[in-house]
Regions:
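Conserved ABC ATPase "signature" region
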Residues: 117, 121, 128-146
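ABC transporter nucleotide-binding domain
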Residues: 193-285
Length: 330
């Protein structure tokens, strides 16, 4: 989506090209305030290539960040550069962005092919070029077989894929997806995750927001964590988890004989507590999650235990936020 041109000013008339070696997205001390409310506070980050998960609870600032990147909002302070260019001085970089908004605004009476073709025409393609491009992007998201059916007959997951397809008609180098998995069934989630991963493998810079940790984990380990408008973490999710190894964790194990399994697990030096919440469940308390998980498979097999599930109930986004904020998550 293009910004309000009256706010941006006149586009530069000279030919534009991305700055070589510049980050695709660069924010320097960016803040956005509404009166006394700080939606984002002094965010600095640089992103280029591959998939990055933008994590945060509701109200963390994810949508505000995306609206700033898309030019729908202007920073209260700080600077934003896309492909090395300040888009508020020259809006040309917006032509290289594809945006998938959280909310649906599609015409249910249109076919997916007609809807996507329309956006291709709006990007300057001829009628024939738009048809070819619509075929290409709908095939990429796996909707070729139903491309000429009305969108109103689509499931939630199919509608989400139409939104992704329409964001790809300009062959963007930066793709921004706001909560693309929300409301989708498991099969649709897997399909959309595969599409997002494929875009990352193609070298595109992909930003995907979510408030659900395991969704992002299935797509990428490169994350940005926002909380109350502030940047809490930027980097590899695995590295953040390693830093959390010295704090208490719970492992929940569904099994046929919890007490027999407990006799073997309690010998692990990293285990400091055992409990039996149900007749088919064992809960293990540990200060070293990785060590226990490393030993569990061989311990289970060698001793003939029948295990149905292994889960970490406290290994979620809220736990990471508690760790990063010292337990002061509000």
């Amino acid at each position: 989506m293009m910004p309000d041109m009256q706010q941006v000013g006149q586009a530069q008339t000279q030919q534009w090209a991305p700055e070589i070696n510049a980050p695709v997205v660069l924010l320097e001390n960016v803040s956005k305030t509404y009166g006394k409310i700080h939606a984002l506070s002094e965010i600095t980050l640089a992103l280029s290539g591959g998939v990055t998960g933008i994590l945060g609870m509701n109200g963390a600032g994810k949508s505000t960040l995306f609206n700033l990147l898309m030019g729908k909002l202007k920073p209260s302070s700080g600077s934003i550069k896309l492909f090395g260019t300040d888009p508020w001085k020259n809006p040309a970089p917006y032509a290289k962005i594809g945006f998938v908004p959280e909310h649906e605004k599609m015409h249910d009476w249109m076919t997916a092919h007609g809807f996507v073709s329309l956006f291709a025409r709006l990007n300057g393609l001829t009628r024939d070029e738009a048809r070819v491009e619509a075929d290409r992007v709908l095939d990429f998201v796996g909707l070729t077989d139903v491309a000429h059916k009305q969108i109103g007959r689509y499931s939630k997951g199919m509608r989400q894929r139409v939104k992704i397809a329409h964001a790809l008609v300009n062959d963007p180098d930066l793709i921004v997806l706001d909560e693309p998995l929300q409301g989708c069934d498991p099969l649709a989630r897997t399909t959309i995750m595969n599409v997002i991963r494929e875009l990352g493998k193609m070298g595109r810079t992909v930003l995907v927001s979510s408030h659900i940790l395991h969704e992002i984990e299935r797509i990428t380990e490169q994350i940005v964590i926002l909380h109350n408008g502030r940047l809490l973490a930027l980097g590899n999710l695995h590295a953040i988890r390693e830093k959390m190894d010295n704090i208490p964790h719970t492992i929940s194990i569904g099994c046929e004989n919890p007490k027999e399994l407990a006799k073997d697990i309690i010998n692990n030096n990293a285990v400091y507590g055992i409990s039996f919440p149900r007749s088919d469940n064992l809960q293990v308390q540990t200060h070293n999650l990785n060590e226990v998980h490393r030993e569990l498979p061989s311990l289970i097999v060698e001793n003939g235990h029948i295990v149905n599930s292994i889960d970490n109930p406290d290994d979620d986004l809220e736990s990471i936020l508690n760790y990063l904020t010292g337990g002061f998550v509000s």
